[in-house]
């Protein structure tokens, strides 16, 4: 697509309607280096999904190691951050790697607005021609969401080397034995989930 209008036209009809609705609101787009609001939103999103979050120092380290190739795009409503995504840029590609939204994001359509704004920004200001929406397991919720955008999927294979284990552990959140943990984690106060999450996250792969 050559411009913002072309990008919007390339998106599937139903998803395009959500973006157009968001474009009529008071949502604003901000390119940032300060990761405070991003981490607050991302860690809350993971808590709400029942997943431990990694330490904020990982984002600090990524920004320090790749200062020219990372960027945060945050969507705000009346100054308050409602959605935010941490992105990598590589050889004409933008990769929205870590993203999330406040609970109100669903009502505001701010996540949809955010990814569209990222596409436009990456095209206009970063000379990107490819939007890599990342890997998702077939028929998962994330896969369905990306499919609604009209993304072209490419089959990728996972490879594992077992060191001591005789078989691969099922770490999928769909594994029934994790359901109780997920439900308990969703009920944790944010401060506790942000403190305890990094202590557990590195065990989850």
Predicted feature locations:
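A sequence-level detector of short, solvent-exposed, charge-rich linear segments
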Residues: 26, 30, 57-64, 115, ...
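Low-complexity, flexible helical/coil segments
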Residues: 30-35, 63-68, 108-111, 122-125, ...
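Surface-exposed loop/turn and secondary-structure junction residues enriched for glycine/proline
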Residues: 10-14, 57, 97, 109, ...
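Acyl-donor binding region in acyl/amide transferases
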Residues: 91-155
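Phenylalanine-focused residue identity feature
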Residues: 38, 54, 66, 86-90, ...
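A conserved beta-strand-loop-helix scaffold within acyl/acetyltransferase catalytic domains
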Residues: 1-107, 120-122
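Active-site/acyl-donor-binding loops of N-acyltransferases
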Residues: 1-5, 131-205
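Generic detector of bulky aromatic hydrophobic side chains
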Residues: 1, 17, 51, 62, ...
């Amino acid at each position: 697509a050559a411009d913002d209008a072309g990008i919007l036209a390339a998106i599937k009809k139903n998803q395009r309607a959500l973006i157009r609705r968001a474009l009529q609101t008071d949502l604003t787009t901000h390119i940032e280096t300060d990761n405070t609001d991003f981490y607050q939103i991302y860690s809350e999103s993971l808590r709400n999904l029942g997943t431990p979050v990694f330490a904020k120092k990982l984002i600090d380290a990524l920004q320090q190691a790749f200062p020219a190739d990372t960027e945060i795009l945050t969507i705000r409503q009346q100054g308050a951050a409602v959605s935010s995504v941490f992105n990598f840029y590589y050889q004409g590609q933008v990769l929205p790697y870590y993203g999330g939204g406040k609970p109100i994001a669903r009502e505001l359509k701010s996540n949809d607005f955010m990814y569209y704004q990222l596409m436009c920004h990456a095209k206009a200001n970063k000379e990107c021609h490819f939007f890599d929406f990342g890997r998702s397991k077939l028929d998962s919720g994330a896969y369905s969401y990306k499919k609604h955008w009209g993304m072209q999927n490419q089959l990728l294979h996972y490879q594992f080397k077992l060191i001591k284990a005789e078989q691969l552990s099922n770490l999928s959140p769909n594994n029934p034995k994790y359901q109780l943990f997920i439900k308990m984690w969703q009920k944790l106060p944010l401060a506790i989930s942000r403190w305890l999450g990094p202590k557990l996250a590195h065990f989850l792969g």
